[in-house]
From Swiss-Prot:
<keyword id="KW-1015">Disulfide bond</keyword>
<dbReference type="InterPro" id="IPR013766">
    <property type="entry name" value="Thioredoxin_domain"/>
</dbReference>
<comment type="similarity">
    <text>Belongs to the glutaredoxin family.</text>
</comment>
<dbReference type="GO" id="GO:0015035">
    <property type="term" value="F:protein-disulfide reductase activity"/>
</dbReference>
<dbReference type="Pfam" id="PF13192">
    <property type="entry name" value="Thioredoxin_3"/>
</dbReference>
<feature type="disulfide bond" description="Redox-active">
    <location>
        <begin position="13"/>
        <end position="16"/>
    </location>
</feature>
<protein>
    <recommendedName>
        <fullName>Probable Thioredoxin</fullName>
    </recommendedName>
</protein>
<comment type="function">
    <text>Does not function as a glutathione-disulfide oxidoreductase in the presence of glutathione and glutathione reductase. May be a component of a ribonucleotide-reducing system distinct from the previously described systems utilizing thioredoxin or glutaredoxin.</text>
</comment>
<keyword id="KW-0249">Electron transport</keyword>
<dbReference type="InterPro" id="IPR011767">
    <property type="entry name" value="GLR_AS"/>
</dbReference>
<keyword id="KW-0676">Redox-active center</keyword>
<dbReference type="InterPro" id="IPR012336">
    <property type="entry name" value="Thioredoxin-like_fold"/>
</dbReference>
<feature type="domain" description="Glutaredoxin">
    <location>
        <begin position="2"/>
        <end position="85"/>
    </location>
</feature>
<dbReference type="GO" id="GO:0005737">
    <property type="term" value="C:cytoplasm"/>
</dbReference>
<dbReference type="InterPro" id="IPR004502">
    <property type="entry name" value="Thio_glut"/>
</dbReference>
<dbReference type="InterPro" id="IPR036249">
    <property type="entry name" value="Thioredoxin-like_sf"/>
</dbReference>
<dbReference type="GO" id="GO:0045454">
    <property type="term" value="P:cell redox homeostasis"/>
</dbReference>
Length: 85
């Protein structure tokens, strides 16, 4: 099963580049086991509202918000590994 990762960001968010960087590292590590979608909440506000997000960056894994704020590499990799298993 492919794990779906959604990263919610905004252009003015100072922490969003860190979240994107760690997700990009995860994509390199896990390859085709994960599908990454980067969502700019200024463009796709509805999806953020559907998740009830009040802050960015936020990361949803398989439809569940798992992180608000930029997670550490180990935290994110562990959460992804849990979903793959």
């Amino acid at each position: 099963m492919v794990v779906k990762i959604e990263v919610f960001t905004s252009p003015t968010c100072p922490y969003c580049p860190m979240a994107i960087e760690v997700v990009d590292e995860a994509k390199k590590e896990f390859g085709d086991k994960i599908d990454v979608e980067k969502i700019d909440i200024m463009v796709d506000r509805e999806k953020a509202i559907d998740y009830g997000l009040m802050a960015v960056p936020a990361i949803a894994i398989n439809g569940v918000v798992r992180f608000v704020g930029a997670p550490g590499r180990e935290e994110l990799f562990e959460a992804i590994s849990d979903e793959i298993e």
